[in-house]
């Protein structure tokens, strides 16, 4: 492959085999089962008005945050022309901790709640002794981060985080200079997501939001997180054949939970009304500092709403409540 040029702007370890590429490449442009519709595709080629003299940010609707390296390279993936990349060049501004890229997608119908993302990717090792993290992050249309898949270039572990910001191991590792096809399947009606590399499922039916965030697709893009912001590595991630398809979900769209304050009982308990999908279990959680959340009650709203009470509320100066789909 060719290095980027300066742009004018605790679980069993299972290494994903690069030989899977032979079968995955042929699937990169395949039509998904059912009535999947492509809402965005990029091969990052000159024919799509991509210019390797410039950063990827501001080309074909791509946006970004941070001043770290990003742009286009040629023939890192043999026979596939140009690729996008993030990394390699250190940020131009002091104090930055990451550079991120995303490409907003419009025109998804409300009933198209199942979103599939595929991309070819490769992480190139550092030669300066510093190794960073490369991630793919999913955001909803309110710019709230839902889920993250993390490729830790220090340990080569693949980790993930839900919107509680706690990173957990998938149990898989990756290799540098190996070409993978990454696939996200997100079902916003069912509030779940899965990730695979070719035939290997890394995560299956994990929760998209644990905090009651809006279950809508906004964007999905790469991040370069500097492990030592003052001395980032010259590692970088190359990606190509970026594709998003949408289709209707098999799951009916469920109403998100709601909470309303209704006052105090005669014996001093706080009273709340919980609404939502009649047959879905929701967990109401309570906190006094917005950091540590404790389950209060799990219940179904029924056809109208469910009354929730908190007998310990009088013992606290302040009390916060939230509802989420039960595990």
Task: Please provide the spans of the model-predicted regions.
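Secretory/extracellular carbohydrate-interaction modules
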Residues: 47, 80-157
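Short, aromatic/His-centered strand-loop micro-motif at the edge of beta-sheets
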Residues: 159-181
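Short, composition-biased motifs enriched in small/polar/acidic residues
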Residues: 251-327
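Flexible glycan-contacting loops in extracellular carbohydrate-active proteins
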Residues: 206-238
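Bacterial N-terminal signal peptides
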Residues: 17-28
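Extracellular beta-strand elements of beta-rich domains used
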Residues: 44, 240-244
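Short tryptophan-centered beta-strand motifs in secreted/extracellular beta-sheet-rich domains
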Residues: 117-119, 178-188, 193-195
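Extracellular glycan-recognition surfaces and repeat-rich motifs
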Residues: 48-89
